[in-house]
Amino acid sequence: MINYLRGQAIEVIKTPNNRLILILDVNQIGYEIQIPSRLALDIGNNNNDSCQIFTHLLLREEQPLLYGFGTAPERELFRQLLSVNGVGAQLALALIDTLGIEELVVAIVTGNTKILSKTPGVGLKTAERIALELKTKLAAWRQLREATTTITAILPAAAILEDVQMTLLALGYSQEEIDRAMAVLSQDALFSKNTQPEDWIKGAINWLG
């Protein structure tokens, strides 16, 4: 599985069926990656400089297809959409392109089918199905993502944070468990001002049980 590709954006080609294909040169190998129009615009604004694309490989009988996104959360949302019955890759891309990641997640979590139906090809029944099947999953995902984003502004210096993470890893906790614990602790007003790694370690261990 290809997690991401980093290379030189050669060009973005628009196919006859209006799909945008990025030609990405990685070590003299040109990859064809279908991307959302929002990402194509970003690449154009950056004068086709070196970029990192988070990819999803979709295996079809005819040929394998690569889809690319500017961020890992966008790719994760794309994958969540693909898990919904009746939602294919093109519709998932259209949803992300039309609404953007934040508005799309909010619409799904709140069950706002009117907003979801703004996307071409998404009727009321499809919108209802998306909201029904993903509401709970995306509510938890959104909460963790927001908490993780908040950590950057709240946690102590990077060196202290590294000490905390290395200690917890040495104690046998996984990186995912550590991230969850730190996300929760960062919401505590006392921890947000604490610069003692020992306190963060104890707090994480207590939370993880």
Curated annotation (Swiss-Prot):
Residues 158-209 are annotated as: Domain III. Residues 71-149 are annotated as: Domain II. Residues 1-70 are annotated as: Domain I. Disulfide bonds: none annotated. Pfam families: HHH_5, RuvA_C, RuvA_N. Keywords: Cytoplasm, DNA damage, DNA recombination, DNA repair, DNA-binding. Gene3D superfamilies: 5' to 3' exonuclease, C-terminal subdomain, Nucleic acid-binding proteins. InterPro entries: DNA_helicase_Holl-junc_RuvA_I, Hlx-hairpin-Hlx_DNA-bd_motif, NA-bd_OB-fold, RuvA, RuvA_2-like, RuvA_C. Residues 150-158 are annotated as: Flexible linker. It comes from the Bacteria. The RuvA-RuvB-RuvC complex processes Holliday junction (HJ) DNA during genetic recombination and DNA repair, while the RuvA-RuvB complex plays an important role in the rescue of blocked DNA replication forks via replication fork reversal (RFR). RuvA specifically binds to HJ cruciform DNA, conferring on it an open structure. The RuvB hexamer acts as an ATP-dependent pump, pulling dsDNA into and through the RuvAB complex. HJ branch migration allows RuvC to scan DNA until it finds its consensus sequence, where it cleaves and resolves the cruciform DNA. Belongs to the RuvA family. Homotetramer. Forms an RuvA(8)-RuvB(12)-Holliday junction (HJ) complex. HJ DNA is sandwiched between 2 RuvA tetramers; dsDNA enters through RuvA and exits via RuvB. An RuvB hexamer assembles on each DNA strand where it exits the tetramer. Each RuvB hexamer is contacted by two RuvA subunits (via domain III) on 2 adjacent RuvB subunits; this complex drives branch migration. In the full resolvosome a probable DNA-RuvA(4)-RuvB(12)-RuvC(2) complex forms which resolves the HJ. This is Holliday junction branch migration complex subunit RuvA. The lineage of its organism: Bacteria, Bacillati, Cyanobacteriota, Cyanophyceae, Oscillatoriophycideae. The gene is ruvA.
